[in-house]
């Protein structure tokens, strides 16, 4: 059975650090976006440039996946009102963003979402995924209003 818990102060601090690192990542791999607020478009450009650079060092790959994933999760939290949580199941615990708890449960694991795209070397997916998730959240919200 899945267990959902709010994040603690340490986890909130780690998220903040990842967002700071995501901004630095964009500065390094998409210089034209440097000095501007972090956007999914900028993250898409930086991630595509980084993937094209052929990274192979495991610790660096994991770090970048976390930077980009956490920034994606924060965009979902900021834009759609989802909340950061720790989701635990029989496979372990991970950071996720949650919407409509107990009423439809939208649960997105943003770092895992990015990791799967990294495995396929897929790029330019963040903005489109955000649009799709926005549509899904809107559909659930409309269904909740009807019932």
Where are these regions (language model features)?
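Amphipathic protein-protein interaction modules
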Residues: 62-117
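A recognition module on extended beta-rich or small alphabeta surfaces enriched in W/G with H and D/E
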Residues: 98-147
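Generic structural signal of hydrophobic/aromatic residues within well-ordered alpha-helices
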Residues: 15, 22-26, 43, 47, ...
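Short secondary-structure junctions and interdomain/linker hinges
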Residues: 22, 29-33, 50-57, 75-78, ...
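N-terminal low-complexity, intrinsically disordered segments
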Residues: 1-62
